[in-house]
Each structure stands twice: as C-alpha cells, then as structure tokens.
From Swiss-Prot:
Record Pfam families: HGTP_anticodon, tRNA-synt_His
Catalytic activity from the UniProt record: tRNA(His) + L-histidine + ATP = L-histidyl-tRNA(His) + AMP + diphosphate + H(+)
The organism's taxonomic lineage, starting at the top: Bacteria, Pseudomonadati, Pseudomonadota, Alphaproteobacteria, Rhodobacterales
Cell location: Cytoplasm
Name recorded for this polypeptide: Histidine--tRNA ligase
Subunit structure: Homodimer.
Top class in the EC scheme: ligase
Keyword Aminoacyl-tRNA synthetase in record: yes
Biological process terms in GO annotation: histidyl-tRNA aminoacylation
HAMAP family named in the record: His_tRNA_synth
Species name: Cereibacter sphaeroides (strain ATCC 17023 / DSM 158 / JCM 6121 / CCUG 31486 / LMG 2827 / NBRC 12203 / NCIMB 8253 / ATH 2.4.1.)
Amino acid sequence: MAKDKASRRPRAETPKGFRDYFGADVTERKAMLDAVAEVYHRYGFDPLETSAVETVEALGKFLPDVDRPNEGVFGWQDEDGDWLALRYDLTAPLARVAAQFRNDLPSPYRRYAMGPVWRNEKPGPGRFRQFYQCDADTVGSASVAADAEICAMLSDALEVVGIPRGDYIVRVNNRKVLNGVMEVAGVLDPSDPAKFEAERGIVLRAIDKIDRLGETGVRALLGSGRKDESGDFTKGAGLSDEQAEVVMGFMAARRDTGAATAARLRELVGASTLGCEGVQELETIAELLDVQGYGPDRIVVDPSVVRGLGYYTGPVFEAELTFEILDEKGRKRQFGSVAGGGRYDDLVKRFTGQSVPATGVSIGVDRLLAALRAKGRAGAEAQGPVVVTVMDRDRMGDYMAMVGELRRAGLRAELYLGNPKNFGNQLKYADARKSPVAVIQGSDEAARGVVVLKDLVLGAQIAAGASLEEWKSRPAQVEVPRADLVRAVQDMLS
C-alpha cells in the first residue's frame, strides 16, 4: 500500500541559489566586517540596521546595472494587499530611511550598513540568491570632499583587513566628464536631454564591456553593431568613426600623473560646461586626497573606470585588487574588483520631491573574503575549544568547575556532553572540534589531586611523523596539579 503523500518526510536540502555558513566562514566574515566597521566608525559614520523586508513601492528603481530593477526580488502580497519584498541591496532601504526620518537625522547623514541581501535571479557557479554587502554613504552633501573621503575610507578599509599597498588600487572617474565627451561627440544635447537617449544607452553599455570585448568589439558597438560568436547581432549606437574616436579617447585618457590625465580630459571635453565641471571635480578630489597622503600608489584618476556610469551622476570609484591568482583552469589572472561606488543624486526625491545628493561605496563581502583567503590572510583552520572529558558520570560537578575556571580565564572551553561511556569517542569528538587540548581526570587522578592534559595538536604531529627528538622534547600528554589547571593549559596553548 502506497504511503500517504501527506506523511512524506521533508527533504533536508538547501534551496537552489542559497548556502549555509558554518563556523570559520561566519567568524572570518565577522572579523573582517568588524575591522571595516572600526574604520567607518573612525571616520564618523554611524551604523544603521534596517528591516530585511521593504515595501515593493519603497524599493523603487535603485538597483544599478540592471535594465529592469523591479524584477528579480523575492516578493509577496500580505493580507492587507500591500506588496512586500526582501531587500535586494542596502541603498534602497537608505533612501526610505533618509526620507522617513529626514526631520530627525543630521544633515549630512553618514551611515554604514552591513548584512545580507536577496535577489531572485537564476543561480550559477559563484552566483547566489543571498549574499552579503557592506555599504557606507553620505547623504545630503554635494561637496566632492565627501567623495574624496569615501575613497580614502575605502583605501583604509582594504589595508586594515589585510590587503597591503601595491596589491590594490582605488580608481576614480566622473560621469560628468563622459557626458561632456558625449556632448562633444554629438550624442548629448544639453538643451534637450531626452534627445539621443537611446544612443547614449548603447554607448554606456558598450564601454562597460571593454574588458570582455576589447577595443575592437566596443568600436563595433559604437558604430553599426556587432555580431558575436554565435551569430547573434547586437545593434550599435550608429556613431561615425570620428564620434567613436572621441569616446574611445576618453577611455584611454589616463596619463602618468593626475594633472596630466586632467589636462587630457580637458582637451576631450572641449567647451562642454558639464564636462569641464567634471574635470574640475576630479582635480579637487585628487588634491584633497594628496594632502592626506593618499598618493597614486593607492588612489588614481582613471577614465577607464566605466562600470556604473549609467547609474551614477558624478564621481565614480572602484577598488581593484591587482595581485594574481590561479583560475579554475590553473591560469594566472588578476583578482579584479571588490568594491565600487559613486555619487548619485535624487536619493529621496521620489519620496519627498526634494533633490538630495548622496555618495557612497559598497564592498562585495564574499569577494573580499575570497581575496583574503587567496592572500593567506584568511581561511586558516580555526582552533576549537579546550574539551574537558568525562571519566566518571557522578563527578559532573567537578568537570563543570574545570570548564568554568578555564572560561573565566578567557579560554574557550566546553564540557563533553555526549555519552561518556566510550572514552575513545570523546577524543574523536575533540579531534572533530579541532580542539588543541583535552582535559582528563579519572577517579585515580582526582584522588591524587592532578589532571592529565593531552596536547592534541602535538599528538596529531607525532601521528603524522614527528621525530623521536621532537616527541621527547615535548610529550603529548602531561600530568599537572589540579590547582595549576588554568596555567598549564595556557602554557600548552602558547
């Protein structure tokens, strides 16, 4: 007789696109974020925690680099008919908070936020539906000093978590400069911003693909179009060769110094008022960073930074890790970007009708943690707690007292709470917990007022082939007076 479907046991499995985080994954991420938070705190930023759930209306259209930002969320309709969704980033909740509490918050408002976000997108290798973000934003300041501060803070954050100078670079660009270039190229009319909007969209998407398509592919998209390897044709912006040359010149404008780069950009933007304003902003940012000691070894003006230019309205920044790693096929490649941000106006305008400038940065937490592991700054096997074993069930109070003493001394310790019948299983448990030391006291040791400390780390080394001399110089098991338990464990751990 077939079992009733209602009685079928549920499958114990993680939903597609999600993952579970255990022990070291959690502690390493927390340690990294704590270090970043300390930098943000030092810069005067306050923490903000918002609900994981927002109204779909409040989420709005703040997701960068996606043509249809209202799609791809985990949403549902509540009993009142309101549509709710899990937040897909940390910027949209900030927009709502800045509008809702605008009369209570200081202006400018400086906040940082860290936490998971959710996107209902097709999962793939390294692409999950839940991931962590770490943002810092200044809301309410139009000064480019706020942008310079974000760049400096990002540089400090990378260094404090273990990315040394020389292994990263923060690159700065400006959307206004690109707009000036497009004005010179004839695809932006300041008196009629809607004119050539479609062409500008194609230009932005084309230059954003420079790393993947190369100069030839981008030139094709700026012109009539491009046919890919599969034969699919993508329509281009329809720019002439002269117009395309102006755009490509913008992307190749970086020179050896910030001043030389700015001079080249001024040539490209010509008489464009907006373009000249953007160049001036880049010069000011470079000057403000220079007086603080952030030289070109850490932060540079680089017009080749194009990611996010379709979203941001002014300065744009990207942190790129420059050291090499091996990909899944064993080939060397540069690690790449781990953070990005920029200035975006009208953060709360759709809520209040008032224009509010803002600038900020978002760190890809999982990517940065992967970078630290690649550099050997994270991913090391975490040490477990000292395990106090149980030899006599009727002496649990004695064992609990030992655990308490170790904990009060600041040591991580736990009492074995499984079935104590098989002592071998207790040591296997300690090994599984990566415990460095096991504390043992049977009735004989208790009568003599001693405890036995088993050095599990040394024991593993001996099992792996330590020399006889090493074994003799440091025995893997020692007997110490019960009163010296804490000191002896501390010595063994050191």
